[in-house]
């Protein structure tokens, strides 16, 4: 059962550690820490992806900034309560970490596979420049009755396809994790820069159950 659940949420990221470790929480005496990994895109830009690491995987007292890593794990979410609202916080939960000398130009720096359920009516729209986009929120089951809620963004014909999905349908998604900056209105006239994380979908299929 547990192995099957782990198979439905698989992530590989390759990139450079660019921050110190910051304590997140402790479970049964095991400490978990957050660290940022810079992951290159195909263009010249990059994404900063938050990584959650157990103190049993890495020495969290060490300074690893500048080190290249290959991480396999899962894309996880949890709700943080702030400003009388719940905010969805996303990070890659590391299961294995391997240090690498450097990253090859051709290597895929982030890959993700999800098998979950549509938990919100997909929103299909066109941008002012005519690009077709659909937003999909996927609930991916975890052991012990928990679920991760993963925002996914589809483009072009994938967006048209996803626009017809119904809540409760099972869907497989392949793609990459990306970050996106946006401005959040705080109070009447104040804006705060925030970063959202989502899966940019390259392929998706409905699963007949």
Region annotations inferred by a language model:
Residues 1-209:
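OB-fold and OB-like single-stranded nucleic-acid-recognition modules
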């Amino acid at each position: 059962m547990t192995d099957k659940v782990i198979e439905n949420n698989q992530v590989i990221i390759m990139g450079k550690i660019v921050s110190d470790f910051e304590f997140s929480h402790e479970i049964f005496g095991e400490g978990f820490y957050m660290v940022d990994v810079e992951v290159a895109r195909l263009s010249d830009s990059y994404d900063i992806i938050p990584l959650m690491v157990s103190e049993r995987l890495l020495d969290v007292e060490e300074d690893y900034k500048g080190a290249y890593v290959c991480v396999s794990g899962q894309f996880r979410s949890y709700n943080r309560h702030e400003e009388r609202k719940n905010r969805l916080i996303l990070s890659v939960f590391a299961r294995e970490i391997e240090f690498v000398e450097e990253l090859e130009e051709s290597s895929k720096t982030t890959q993700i596979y999800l098998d979950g359920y549509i938990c919100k009516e997909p929103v299909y729209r066109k941008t002012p420049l005519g690009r077709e986009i659909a937003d999909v929120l996927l609930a991916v089951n975890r052991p012990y009755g928990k679920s991760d809620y993963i925002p996914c963004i589809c483009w072009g014909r994938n967006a048209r396809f996803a626009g017809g999905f119904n809540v409760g349908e099972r869907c497989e998604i392949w793609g990459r994790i990306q970050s996106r900056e946006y401005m959040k209105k705080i109070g009447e006239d104040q804006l705060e820069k925030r970063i959202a994380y989502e899966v940019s979908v390259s392929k998706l299929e409905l699963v007949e159950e």
